[in-house]
């Protein structure tokens, strides 16, 4: 007999693993970047809306609160969450809003406060904890960490389910629920955690996520590695032949997505995706993915696109004067 925490854990020892390949919920790469790096080995194919790429706006908002952890709740953070809901509903009245807390009692406190506010609409608002958001999605997610130093200035919270086995998976689910924006409300800073707490995988990852949101909300660029090659590298690349600066525009690699081979920029603004018969085609699972699914995803995100193949290059048929 074998003792195991779950059927998933038991099956993982006997069956081949297949990685999730794509993410279609989030409008910006930054919203999925943390999970892609920590959970999916940067394998997720994701494409941001072209207008958001050109706006260079951060999808994150960080609200620092001097809250106190008392009786399993943080009143100061709850008040900040209620005010943030009010602001979102004024600026984006049609948005769905999901408030995600890290423990049940904080969720109940926020719900009670919201019920007492007549100007807050509850039709498109859901208040949940980290354990029951699987399958949900919202236009704007408001995270309420809740955990904070106590009245004596010590961080002694046990971090609930986050610190238990599988806690990082709950965190992964929670931070990937947003389609457009995330607001993180927290009383914690990196140096609040002690070394014993950081030995726990879930707590350590929470600290890393808080730092990530802080950095991106301040305008720091994403650290995007080169897309991994799962089949083979081609020795002759049309993409490498035609990329460069031309009169009035540039053709350049777009490292933020593997759904295109090159991006065309005019006066610093992304204007079009170029699809060649290079690595993107080789990495595709089939011709339908390369010639149907990729263009459909580009169209859905507002990217104009055109195909340009090696045969056209050898026949000296120019691409926009190239």
Kindly give the residue locations of the regions a language model identified.
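A short beta-strand element within the Helicase C-terminal
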Residues: 136-148, 156, 182-183
